[in-house]
Amino acid sequence: DSFGKDFDNRYQAMCQSAEDGNVKNFRKTPAKELWKKMLKVLFETSHPWCTFKDPCNIRYTNQHEGVVHSSNLCTEITLHTKASKYKSGEKTEIGETAVCNLGSINLLNHVEEKSTHGKSGYFINYDKLKSTIHTAVRMLDNVIDINFYPTKEAANSNLKNRPIGLGMMAIHDVLHKLNINIDSDESIKFNDELFEFYSCQSIYASSILAKERGFYETYEGSLWSQNIFPIDSYNNLMSYKGQAPLGNGETKKDEWEISRQHVSEFGMRNSNVMAIAPTATIGYINGVEQSIEPNFSVLFVYENKSGNFFITNQHFIDDMKNEGLWSPEVAKLVKDVDGDLSLLDGDIPQWIKEKYKTAFDRNMFKLIECNAARQKWLDQAISFNLYNNSTSLKYLNDIYMECWKSGLKTTYYLRNRAASKVEKSTSEESNSSSSQTSCSIEAMKNGGECESCQ
């Protein structure tokens, strides 16, 4: 149940006790060798996903209630659990099974076109986004009270702590509209500013509900009650790590002052408010890219238990049409290379190739920095895939170490390019033995998505 400095001290004490002969059954394992084995398994299977206990707990809003020992399957939910207590075979105290009600905002629906000096461009309508955030938080809080709970432990946890997980999707679609490459410094700045706004308004929306309906049962003693917001716990985490915080902290001073003052006076309706789920299924249903992920490619096949779905990047097609280059012949060429435009010589302008690179050709370190810019504003975590275009364990070590240094709470799949070839036909039924199973551990083992997080 320990983490942070307490774990460091207890671990060192245990090692010393073993050295002194007080512990008999133990063996020494070089840390580097153990880490290499973990990386090798990750490369071969994409599992197990790496999550970081210290960030999850040092930043946990309800740490006075318990320790975060694990996440959900998709690694965006980081809540504590408690075992039920028994005496003589009878349950004497109902424990807590962490559950969280999820919802995701389609950011592309908040992008509007404007004309300036005869030139058109796109911008995010933040007034509309604010309204959507407040509506979504209210909706998710309502779900807590009308939901079905399969166990008493799940009901106990959800009704006491009232966590919700409001996320986003279509981030890369919006970046395409704004002509920003997802793995650029401009993208890092954009994500920092966007998620600061999203964090401030989500917190404020929950506090407004607290004024109307009362704060959640275990609010007293939480980080919220101590005026420690997600950005504050992020700074505490980076100080513990000895790392410099990313960015400049709160930039929307007036909005944060209103939010902090409201929480101080009325509390929070929900112990946790924000979490970025994968949203693959609902994202593709809505015709947008999942969650905060980069486009996998401009053309690929998405599989779930309902079948195979042909996913195309409409932004790419629109850009090609604007250049007068889109044709059935070009479409066939793109299909022949599995949507990897770098394999086409002379058929597509270089700027389009750069804009629509596959996820494997992106700068992974920039994508990690983008995610760190998001994570610092969130009270829960982000389902975040890593894309590997290398066979080097050193490279894997470097990207996972960068995740840890950046203050990320969790990572999701390690996607390896060699294992991600796209089928060239959508009409042929897949003969793969690793069929996808909705909402199950088997789906995860077979490379599928957990559809409960969609």
Where are these regions (language model features)?
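Structural signal for hydrophobic packing residues in well-ordered secondary-structure cores
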Residues: C15-A18, M38-L42, N106-N109, L129-F148, ...
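Flexible loop/turn segments at secondary-structure boundaries
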Residues: K5, W49-T51, N57-N62, L108-E112, ...
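Alpha-helix capping and helix-loop boundary segments enriched in small/acidic/polar residues
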Residues: N25-T29, L39, E65, G89-T97, ...
